[in-house]
Structures are given as structure tokens and as C-alpha cells.
Amino acid sequence: MKPGIHPEYAEITATCTCGNVIKVNSTAGKPLHLDVCGACHPFYTGTQKVMDTGGRIDKFNKRFGMLGKK
């Protein structure tokens, strides 16, 4: 690595809206404010909702399904 061209790493705090505070190393140099983190994200907490796209797929196939068939 070339000396003198790389940014300095500093320990900063990343604060989530749920109140979780995470200490990370970053080149940003100032505290971060997060919307979601691993403690409150629906995927990690198990509260994720499955979107039912079956209606959209059926509607698409109904409109364009016959175009590919000969």
C-alpha cells in the first residue's frame, strides 16, 4: 500500500431508531444514524411478511401467456 493516500479509520457509533448502539470502524469520521439494524430488521427478527404475488403472476400470464405459444 502506498503511504499517505489511504483514509484514516476511526471508531464511530451507529445508532438505530430502535435504540441499538453499534460501535464500528469507519472512514466516515462522524456518528451514523440507521433506520434499521440487525436487532429490528423484519428478516432477522422473524416478523417478515411474505408478499403474495400469485395474483400478479396469474394476471400477467392471462394477458401475455399465449404470445410465446405457437
Swiss-Prot record:
Alphabetized UniProt keyword annotations: Metal-binding, Ribonucleoprotein, Ribosomal protein, RNA-binding, rRNA-binding, Zinc
Record-listed Zn(2+) binding positions: 16, 18, 37, 40
Cleavable signal peptide: none
A biological process term (GO) from this entry: translation
One family name in Pfam for this protein: Ribosomal_L31
InterPro entries xrefs: Ribosomal_bL28/bL31-like_sf (IPR034704), Ribosomal_bL31 (IPR002150), Ribosomal_bL31_A (IPR027491), Ribosomal_bL31_sf (IPR042105)
GO molecular function: metal ion binding; rRNA binding; structural constituent of ribosome
Presence of the UniProt keyword Zinc in the record: yes
Name used for this protein in its record: Large ribosomal subunit protein bL31
